[in-house]
Design a protein with these regions (language model features):
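Short glycine/serine-rich donor-binding loops of glycosyltransferases
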Residues: 482-486, 504
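Short alpha-helix at the nucleotide-sugar/activated-sugar donor binding site of glycosyltransferases
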Residues: 77, 489-491
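Carbohydrate transferase catalytic cores enriched for Leloir-type hexosyltransferases
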Residues: 1-377, 381-383, 387-405, 410, ...
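A short alpha->beta transition loop at the rim of the catalytic pocket in nucleotide-sugar-dependent
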Residues: 469, 491-493, 914
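Short hydrophobic beta-strand element within catalytic cores of glycosyltransferases
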Residues: 495-498
């Protein structure tokens, strides 16, 4: 509401508070209806504060003079966080209703600091707050030092926190007669996914705390308990009745059974249990089941242009799916994330910035204890009592390293003993990997000793668990998933061999046989033979495994952790965007379209930061509009491509450009241009207005002159700075200022105006050499700017790798003949747009002298004719240069002009040249 004050506030707190911790909220402009403005603004502010999920809310002002003009209402009455208010004085307010509103709102405060020179009982009467909630502050300096110092205030907050925690614990211990309502969204049995079986085991435990409706997209649910204790609905029901629920819990895995959850989560926020960290296979299936570019969009959203580029560079999609996490949308839309391992939580921290406003926790995979009867299980499966059974549980696939186990078993002494069997309890891979396993079994003639069961029902799966002597569960290329089959084996007390891949590295070494992540085949052979030959070792592993399952993975323990996580995450189910919009609609339904757009924009800007990484915006306005393929544009392309291929850790790269709409200027994403530059299809993304947030960086890599000036007048850079975006410009030179005669008339004035804007709005200016940086420093000292703090001027060197600038291709038909002429004699080369300061006339005159003196050498000029959009009278010496070249007697003999050639051709010209002439003035 007061944009002109924000920059000074940020500067005041610089060094005391991270800039990312200064958050800005937005409200529409004050319209004709002041009452509507106040109500809309209060709603926007309240939900902005809720989205931050604060521990405390401190209001430093409420009853001060003119405070009725400000939006300072504490928050909604049902707020989940305590509020403290400072009351410095109470003045008469013209609008008595405004006073009453503030007094009513003050009653929400958990604590009221006052500096009013009145007895406490009088303050209670005036303010309407409880005596216990008032803390009187004296303003005398000595009193502040001795009585109300930082330690004293710290103690107040500490005591209140303890009081609130105690109150929370009392609430938690109350009888759950009115259980909150939970929508549980997950595939369920009989669907062939581990998440379905997991949910069937978890639901009875959650039912102790919640009234549960299950949301599925399947023909029927086979689990008896679920049918008897839960109401079953489909996703359409949830979409239409979401407000009936206190919480929504999503279970997200990597199979097609979870596709319907993606659409639900987009419109109904909830807590997501992420069973597979990557879930890229899910979006690949989404794209192949009727959602065009679903994988492209998720790759772009989460990994940026680099991942999209790689997709079209790879021969197939398998590699891109394997290498890239596609969970960004899920994480951004979730109120909180639950993982089953520390490994997945670690992946979250490694992949995304800590400032991302998403909470996460780790809840171990639960396992229900089953009373297994080994003898009965073996009898039902046809396994003899004296047979030694090694099992690997779960679907077969390359990441499960089943072939590795098979080869180790065949190499071990177990394979030569008829009483030993290897059983893969699961469905074989349908691709070449599964075929390889079958061929290996056939080749070694061990069909009677090695078995692949195919998909087994839950009852049969448990029989194999009860009948096994050893389990081997191997992994590679972990995607953050938790191996439920390892816990199954441990739950049944099966001595289990695993390798330290992903979350399995967290298993206790005395409860499993833990191999290195990348182990030798001989290591696995040794483990198999040792456990076969040493029953006491098997017994010890079995005992410890059961102990860990009982103490860490029991349903009662995990259920309590789920309840704590669900209750502790932001309760925005009934305070979320859907409710906010419902509350806004009656207030603004009769307003103009312009006003509605303002409100919509404020809604977007007020969202708590759920960017998974910060953004480095690269301003390529001039390059994307009319890429002249000349110096500055070539530099801009080269920097852009390098950043796309090697983004700084914690940042995504977003090329942007300035655009004008009805007098207002904005930055838009340069998606169409960038995808074309990367040789990717560009019809699936639009150039939307950018969404910048605190901690982002804008780097202007080319020269957009007048558009930058107009954008500054429109408030573009002020708004970015207010949001906490760092603004950085490149200055290539000061030549229009230093040599105005070398540029079109008036260019020095427009350039000076651009330079003043750059120096006014930038946090840092990057020059292309120390010499330019020194010149700019002098120029800044001789000009005055409205700046809060000094301008940071730095410099860098430019590179010269033509191949990394997205070079243009194409060779004219006469190229071979021309290049042959260059190779026949000494050839000197000039490269650059034909402009007054490039020294063409002087160079041609010098060569005329050399030719007259008998030197048989070539002069090659490569470059377009400059300033062609201007009349000749404004082009200085350019017409004279062009006329000189075109009418020269040596043209195409020993003087060559290659106008607008491709970069591919230019590289060959460089290779055929003897020397480069750099005749430019001020270069």
């Amino acid at each position: 509401l007061f944009p002109e004050t924000i920059d000074s506030i940020r500067n005041e707190f610089d060094g005391l508070l991270p800039q990312e911790n200064i958050r800005i909220w937005y409200a529409p402009e004050l319209g004709a209806n002041n009452e509507t403005f106040i109500k809309v603004s209060e709603l926007l502010r309240e939900y902005f504060l809720i989205s931050l999920n604060p521990d405390w809310l401190l209001l430093p002002t409420l009853f001060e003079p003119d405070s009725d003009k400000f939006i300072v209402r504490p928050s909604v009455a049902n707020s989940e966080f305590p509020i403290e208010v400072f009351v410095h004085q109470i003045t008469e307010i013209k609008d008595t209703q405004a006073y009453k509103n503030k007094a009513t709102n003050l009653q929400q405060a958990k604590l009221c600091f006052t500096a009013i020179d009145l007895p406490v009982d009088k303050q209670v009467q005036l303010l309407g707050v409880k005596v216990d909630n008032i803390r009187k502050l004296a303003l005398a300096p000595y009193d502040l030092k001795d009585k109300y110092n930082s330690q004293s205030i710290k103690k107040i907050f500490k005591d209140l926190s303890a009081q609130l925690l105690n109150q929370e614990e009392k609430t938690s211990s109350l009888s759950l007669t009115n259980k909150p309502k939970l929508a549980y969204v997950s595939p369920l049995p009989p669907l062939q996914t581990g998440v379905a079986d997991y949910s069937a085991e978890l639901l009875p435990e959650l039912e102790k705390y919640y009234q549960i409706d299950v949301i599925v997209e399947q023909d029927h649910v086979s689990d008896v308990w679920i049918n008897e204790n839960c109401t079953i609905h489909d996703s359409q029901w949830l979409a239409e009745n979401a407000n009936e629920y206190d919480h929504v819990l999503y279970h997200m895995g990597n199979s097609h059974f979870h596709l319907y959850i993606i659409d639900l989560l987009e419109i109904i926020p909830g807590i997501t249990v992420l069973h597979d960290f990557y879930i890229s296979g899910l979006f690949y299936q989404r794209e192949n089941t009727g959602i065009p570019n679903a994988l492209n969009a998720e790759l772009y959203n989460g990994r940026g242009y680099k991942a999209v580029k790689e997709r079209y560079a790879y021969e197939d999609d398998a590699r891109i799916v394997r290498e890239n996490a596609c969970n960004t949308t899920i994480i951004q839309q979730s109120q909180g994330i639950i993982f089953h391992s520390k490994y997945s939580s670690q992946l979250l921290q490694e992949c995304y910035v800590p400032e991302m406003n998403v909470e996460s926790c780790v809840i171990p995979h639960l396992r229900v204890k089953y009373n297994s009867d080994r003898e009965s299980a073996r009898k039902q499966l046809g396994i003899k009592p004296d047979e030694f059974i090694v099992c690997s549980f779960g679907l077969l696939g390359e990441t499960k390293r089943n072939q590795c186990l098979l080869e180790a078993w065949l190499a071990s002494s177990l394979s030569s003993n008829k009483q030993c069997k290897l059983i893969f309890v699961g469905k074989n891979s349908e691709g070449s990997y599964g075929e390889k396993i079958v061929r290996t079994i056939s080749r070694h003639k061990v069909k009677k000793q090695v078995l692949i069961t195919g998909w087994t029902k839950t009852e049969e799966f448990r029989l194999y668990l009860a009948a096994s002597d050893i389990a081997v569960q191997l992994r590679m290329a972990s995607r953050g998933e938790t191996s439920g089959t390892v816990l199954d084996a441990m739950n049944y007390g099966i001595p289990t061999i695993v390798n330290a891949n992903g979350s399995m590295a967290e298993l206790a070494k005395d409860a499993v046989w833990l191999l290195e992540d990348e182990f030798e085949n001989s290591d696995l052979v040794s483990a198999l033979e040792t456990l076969w030959q040493q029953p006491e070792k098997r017994q010890e592993l079995s005992r410890k495994a059961k102990e860990i399952i009982t103490t860490k993975h029991a349903p009662e323990i995990c259920g309590k952790q789920y309840r704590k996580a669900i209750e502790n995450y932001p309760k925005t189910r009934k305070l979320g965007n859907q409710t906010l919009i419902s509350n806004l609609v009656p207030l603004i339904s009769n307003e103009s379209d312009k006003y509605l757009l303002q409100v919509a924009r404020c809604l977007s800007q007020n969202q708590a930061n759920k960017k998974v990484v910060k953004t480095l915006f690269i301003d390529i306005t001039a390059t994307s509009r009319n890429d002249l393929k000349t110096g500055i544009e070539r530099v801009a392309r080269a920097i852009l491509l390098q950043l796309i291929n090697n983004p700084p850790k914690g940042y995504r790269i977003e090329p942007v450009y300035l655009a004008e709409d009805e007098g207002s200027w904005y930055y838009r994403y340069a998606r169409n241009y960038t995808l074309s530059l990367l040789n990717c299809p560009n019809d699936w993304l639009s150039d939307d207005v950018i969404d910048a947030q605190t901690g982002d960086i804008l780097f202007a890599g080319d020269l957009a002159g007048g558009m930058v000036v107009e954008a500054e007048k429109s408030g573009v850079y002020c708004e970015l700075r207010n949001k906490g975006v760092s603004i950085n410009f490149t200055v290539f030179d000061l030549l229009p200022e230093q040599c105005p005669e070398m540029f079109p008339p008036g260019a020095n004035l427009s350039y000076a105006e651009w330079l003043k804007v750059v120096c006014k709005v930038s946090d840092k200016v990057v020059c292309i050499s120390k010499a330019v940086a020194d010149e700019l420093d002098v120029w800044v000292d001789s000009n005055s700017f409205e700046r809060v703090k000094p301008l940071n001027i730095n410099w860098m060197h430019l590179g010269a790798d033509l191949g990394e600038t997205a070079p243009s291709k194409g060779m004219p038909s006469e190229a071979k003949v021309v290049l042959k002429k260059f190779n026949q004699k000494a050839t000197l080369l000039m490269v650059g747009t034909i402009e007054p300061r490039k020294g063409h006339l002087q160079t041609i005159a010098a060569f005329e002298m050399l030719w007259q003196q008998g030197f048989d050498i070539n002069l090659v000029i490569v470059g377009k004719e400059g300033w062609q959009d201007l009349p000749d009278e404004q082009r200085r010496t350019i017409p004279k240069i062009i006329n000189k070249i075109n009418k020269h007697s040596e043209l195409n003999k020993r003087l060559f002009w290659l106008d607008g050639i491709s970069d591919e051709y230019l590289e060959k010209v460089y290779s055929s040249s003897t020397c480069l002439i750099a005749a430019s003035e001020g270069e």
